[in-house]
Curated annotation (Swiss-Prot):
This protein's GO CC annotations: cytoplasm
Lineage: Bacteria, Bacillati, Bacillota, Bacilli, Bacillales
Binding positions (3-methyl-2-oxobutanoate): 43-44, 82, 112
CDD domains: KPHMT-like
Protein name (record): 3-methyl-2-oxobutanoate hydroxymethyltransferase
Record's keyword annotation contains Metal-binding: yes
Amino acid sequence: MKNLAKLVEMKQDKTKISMITAYDFPSAKQAQDANIDMILVGDSLGMTVLGYETTTQVTLEDMIHHGKAVRRGADDTFVVVDLPIGTVGVSDEHDLKNAITLYQETNANALKAEGAHLVNFIKKSTQIGIPIVAHLGLMPQSVGVMGYRLQGSTKDAAEQLIQEAHAVQEAGAVALVLEAIPSDLAGLISEQLDIPVIGIGAGKDTDGQVLVYHDMLNYGVDRYAKFVKQFGDFSVGIDAIKHYDEEVKAGTFPAEAHTYKKKILNEVNSND
């Protein structure tokens, strides 16, 4: 398993870090079998798996349920689990209770928290031994306020992002996700920080990349962000399901090859 020291070493060696989301046992197993460096159990599962419009409806219980499944499928991969909206940013007692619960229940390697306003939470969590991955730029939990658009696109906004990146590192964050920001800004932040910086829609100059499993595989998703590249096409599964439906209705499935050869009725009738 790649630990934090190995991820930092990859950054120092300029070896790109690959990260992908996974939400269940089979997707996690696929990621591990493909030698992905990190898995994110993102609250994006609200949209990709649970059918919500945004991530804001995802609960702590949802993250625990899916986080456990991912860990079972990827027992030798660095797994990060999202802290969903409302679980942190309230009070120290409230925040740490939720973080401890999620960390222990999922057996994650780290938790992810959105926003620079959680600097104190990052510091407190680090002090009790829970590694935190910070998330800046576009923050899906705050789309009701900021919307889905490029962040850090003005001088003031860019300077603020740089300050926030340094602040979360100083607070103890073990890595940083930058989403939907100009590529030159992301490259500068990656260069300035000692911790690994993972980009999504942040250009190629970050220390690594993360994509959503369902986006990159065209799996049940109708709309895609500009930064998504489809590396496969799971939508072909629809054709397979249609074919199955046709064969059931035509009576051609199951065929003899899919049927047990054991005959039992003669034995049953002989008891009469």
